[in-house]
From Swiss-Prot:
Gene Ontology, cellular component aspect: nucleolus; nucleus
Function: ATP-binding RNA helicase involved in the biogenesis of 60S ribosomal subunits and is required for the normal formation of 25S and 5.8S rRNAs.
Protein name, per record: ATP-dependent RNA helicase dbp7
Gene Ontology MF terms in the entry: ATP binding; ATP hydrolysis activity; RNA binding; RNA helicase activity
Gene: dbp7
Originating species: Emericella nidulans (strain FGSC A4 / ATCC 38163 / CBS 112.46 / NRRL 194 / M139)
């Protein structure tokens, strides 16, 4: 096309085409943030020029005549700290103290130092509970012994020898209600039985007394039938009774009670076989002969399979203590094997008076009447024995209405506290400080937590050396001699309890020294046994922090207080926890920690355990606990900050805190299904919860130390990878694997899809095992 000589001239304003600045570097989040700031400046240039717009700007309009204009170039104020000066945040620069800061501060390494008392959720029913200020009358104990007197035991059918032994040696003047009902029934008929009663009402003696009485009667029958009259039932006569319990600690306690009973019948021999002990020693005891055997299901099933010296042909009584717990812990397979082998090996006895068939007794405080799970334990025509006469008439109706109902001893004073996640640890410390403030007010207390890692962390927190103790570690010579004298006065702890017993510096004071114990299922068996024995025998103020391993059946003397720092995984387990106190008619107290929000609905479950509808259930406020324990919020904040600095200064304890935090979250997800709407893991504020473990890291930055494979695990994975890929095996040169590890890193061709899948599966199994090990109860 020919040039027509036309000239086009478009004139554009200069502000139409603006230079586009391309943002480079940084992460995509940072680039996006810069873009948003630039867009906001472009849309509102006046606000950005003034800094805060109408707040500090110089726009036209009425102004306060008393206002003094301050230059924006003035530096922020600084607060003097122990190490010098520290720049304050924006909120503190305007006059807010360190204890009243509204927002979190940045610490070292990107950690967050937040205030204890900011942004805490308020309880839903914060004002509803302060209604009943009238003092309540003390309730009549429901698990106390009946009328005193020697005739009460003899009237139940026990021999005068056994009744006199109970009165003189064991100092038991009268039976409890459940003992009266069970002894009468079990001595009268040879049938299977359910024994259900409150915690602390003497269920162990309820089945041991009829058992010992029956075997003592066999001794008399054999003496009468023997011409010489000089022989009786002895250890070679055979095994007559087996008692199964879910935990090793409960087996030990049953064995101690049984040995105390058998002192009046020395010819009857009892023994134990439990996990964690040497099989060789147990087999030696079985070869010598036993009449009564106390065992855990797993170890008994092992001996029935592999020990020929264990003769069960004469077993006529099988007791399942805490039978529902046996099923819950996964012992169903072992119980089926035990029952089938007992049935197959049963033979008619040549001893006169031995029953023709075996009787099975199942006892627990939270026994449910639906026997679908327990039907496989061969219970036939079982008799239900209950202590409360009010329940006998309406037994079916009560169970139909609420099959999960549980009962709390009437004399137990139970309370709950709605505590924000940030304040959990400092509130627990304040409560325990107040509890042991006066000597003699409380002798023993138990703190229940959810997992073993949490036990280890809190044990170190409560037994750590305080700042004033660290300063006094290097005094002059005179104070050194005094310190040595005080050490000489202290009782030495057994070697088997080192690491599980220490002075509780967080609770102790100058007039009342408190000893701290820890117990969980991951400890070696001899350590668990010696720690529990030391706590039971200690007559000074002491605290046991433990998992549910100590919640079932253990009769620990003089326990005045039970604190559920982490709520139980079910209402039944809650009953067993608080049942460690208020035993045999004695008074006791219990406190449950709950979080604001959906956990407040747990109060209705607590009220169901009371006969009066929960009128005796009281509430404790966080402010009151902190005021009584620390004197106020300022001291509480100081204690928390000191604890966080202690964790940062000690990498070992910081890792322990992280383990406890992660394990606590995993344990929180294991509540029973019908209570999961109350303990909803999605409602947890993970950042606030981390502060209760003395952590300043963000939840996403808290790594799980136990899930990373170690050097030996990595070495095994490499060997398995080479084997599955068909590579040649090479010998390892040392501990680190040396050349093998380095060569494998540079050979991607040896890794196949099958090998990668196997590695992922192994890592997943390690993760599951790491989470499950801390809930080990048996």
């Amino acid at each position: 096309m020919a040039d027509d000589g036309m000239l086009l001239n478009f004139a554009l304003p200069s502000d139409v085409i603006k230079p586009q600045t391309k943002i480079k570097g940084g992460s995509w989040r940072e680039r996006l943030s810069v873009k948003k700031i630039a867009a906001r400046r472009a849309t509102n240039p006046k606000r950005t020029a003034d800094g805060d717009g109408n707040k500090d700007g110089n726009e036209s309009g009425p102004r306060n005549p008393n206002r003094i204009q301050v230059s924006g170039s003035r530096p922020a104020k600084r607060q003097k700290t122990d190490g010098g000066f520290q720049k304050l945040g924006e909120g503190q620069a305007h006059g807010q103290g360190s204890g009243q800061s509204k927002g979190p501060k940045k610490g070292q390494g990107g950690s967050v130092v937040s205030s204890l008392f900011s942004k805490n959720p308020r309880p839903r029913n914060a004002v509803e509970e302060d209604k009943n200020d009238e003092p309540m009358e003390d309730a009549k104990p429901t698990n106390a012994p009946l009328i005193d007197g020697l005739d009460t035991f003899t009237n139940l059918g026990l021999s005068p020898t056994l009744a006199a032994h109970l009165l003189t040696k064991l100092e038991l003047k009268a039976p409890t209600a459940i003992q009266k009902a069970s002894i009468t029934q079990l001595l009268k008929e040879e049938t299977d039985a359910f024994i259900q009663a409150e915690t602390g009402s003497g269920k162990t003696l309820a089945y041991l007394l009829p058992l010992v009485q029956r075997i003592m009667a066999l001794s008399r029958a054999k003496n009468e039938g023997d011409a010489k009259g000089d022989t009786s039932v002895h250890r070679d006569s055979g095994l007559f009774a087996i008692i199964l319990a879910p935990t090793r600690e409960l087996c030990k306690q049953i064995s101690v009670v049984l040995e105390g009973l058998l002192r009046c019948a020395h010819w009857i021999v009892a023994g134990t076989v439990i996990g964690g002990e040497k099989k060789k020693s147990e087999k030696a005891r079985l070869r010598k002969g036993l009449n009564i055997l106390v065992a855990t299901p797993g170890r008994l099933a092992d001996h029935l399979e592999n020990t020929q010296a264990l003769d069960v042909s004469n077993v006529r009584w099988l007791v399942l203590d805490e039978g529902d717990r046996l099923m819950e812990l996964g012992f169903e397979k072992e119980l089926q094997e035990i029952i089938s082998k007992l049935d197959a090996r049963q033979r008619p006895s040549r001893i006169p008076g031995v029953p023709a068939k075996r009787a099975t007794i199942l006892c627990s405080a939270t026994l449910k009447m639906n026997v679908q799970k327990l039907g496989e334990i061969s219970l036939k025509d079982a008799v239900h024995i209950k202590a409360d006469p009010a329940d006998e008439d309406g037994e079916k109706t009560a169970e139909d209405k609420d099959g999960d109902a549980f009962r709390v001893p009437a004399q137990l004073k139970q309370s709950y506290a709605i505590v924000a996640a940030k304040l959990r640890l400092v509130t627990l410390t304040a409560f325990m400080k107040r509890t042991f403030m006066r000597k003699g007010s409380v002798m023993k207390a138990i703190i229940f937590v959810s997992c073993a890692d949490s036990v280890n962390f809190h044990f170190e927190v409560f037994t750590r050396k305080l700042a004033e103790q660290l300063e006094g570690d290097n005094p002059d010579e005179g104070s050194d001699s005094e310190h040595e004298k005080e050490k000489e006065k202290e009782k030495p702890t057994p070697a088997s309890t080192h690491g599980t017993v220490a002075p509780a510096t967080a609770f102790s004071n100058s007039s009342n020294a408190v000893t701290m114990y820890k117990l969980h299922g991951s400890l070696p068996q001899h350590v668990r046994t010696s720690t529990l024995s030391s706590f039971a025998k200690n007559r000074d103020p002491s605290v046991l922090i433990c998992t549910d391993v100590a919640s079932r059946g253990l009769d620990l003397p003089n326990v005045d207080l039970v604190v559920e720092y982490d709520p139980a995984f079910s209402a039944d387990e809650h009953l067993h926890r608080i049942g460690r106190t208020a035993r045999l008619g004695r008074d006791g107290r219990a406190l449950v920690f709950l979080l604001p929000g959906c956990e407040e609905n747990y109060v209705e479950i607590l009220k169901r355990g009371y006969r009066d509808g929960g009128k005796a259930l009281t509430r404790s406020t966080t402010d009151d606990i902190l005021k009584r324990g620390f004197g106020g919020n300022i001291e509480s904040q100081k204690w928390q900050l000191e604890l966080e600095r202690w964790a940062l200064d000690n990498p070992e304890y910081l890792e322990m805190a992280r383990r406890a935090y992660q394990s606590h979250i995993r344990a929180y997800a294991t509540h029973v299904a019908n209570e999961r709407h109350i303990f909803n893991i999605k409602e947890l504020h993970l950042g606030h919860l981390a502060k209760s473990f003395a952590l300043r890291d963000r939840p996403g930055k808290i790594n799980v130390p136990g899930l990373r494979p170690g050097k030996e695990d990595t070495k095994k994975d490499f060997k398995a990878e080479r084997k599955s890929a068909g590579g040649k095996k090479r010998k390892a040169t040392g501990y680190g694997g040396g050349r093998d590890d380095d060569d494998d890193d540079d050979r991607p061709s040896a890794t196949t899809d099958t090998t990668l899948a196997a590695q992922k599966m192994r890592a997943k199994m390690k993760e599951q095992l790491a989470g499950a090990s801390e809930f080990n109860l048996a």
